[in-house]
Amino acid sequence: MRIEIKDRFNGKVLFAHDQENNSVKATLEAGIRAKADLSYADLNGANLNGAYLNGAYLGEAYMSGAYMCDAYLRGAYLGGTNLNNAYLNGADLDSAYLGDADLNGASLSNACLNNADLNGACLNGAKLNSANLETATYGEGVIIGNNPLFILGLTWPIYIFKTHIKIGCQIHTKQEWLNFSDADIAKMESRASEFWAKWKKHILWMAFEGSK
């Protein structure tokens, strides 16, 4: 049976594979072995549990709701990929690049993200229970660490990492947030002063005490 992996935007066939008892998983694995460029691939809702995708190039692919539990994605390029509500429980994402990926609502429980780069990734509602993030980064020098805290529902989403706090698009070390003057905060955004006056104590407590 022949299965085609197509471009999410124009329907162009990026890779095709034909074998007996074929599946999307087998086709994608064949594409990876062939070193196919699968940027923009439409893999929405695909069943890829346990797939061997080490080193895959899937930049800006559409993998919303895909099942990738226990998949092997070491060193994979997933920059800008839509992984909204994807199931990545137990997946091996060691050294994967996930910059600007959409991980809203994704399940990453027990996933290995050692040395993964998540710079700019959207993590709103992501489930990271027992995920290994100790050496994962959110850009150069920003260590995520295990058990990051996410605060949603306020004016801006807040990510509290091991070394840094990200509020909206502002990301600084915990110590920098602690030491910012009112004037520093006011320069960030027109609503920042009112927001910081209201939530500063709560955010800093969670950053320095609640994350221990």
Predicted regions and their residues:
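Tandem repeat scaffolds
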Residues: 19-155
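N-terminal capping/linker segments that flank leucine-rich repeat
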Residues: 1-37, 140-212
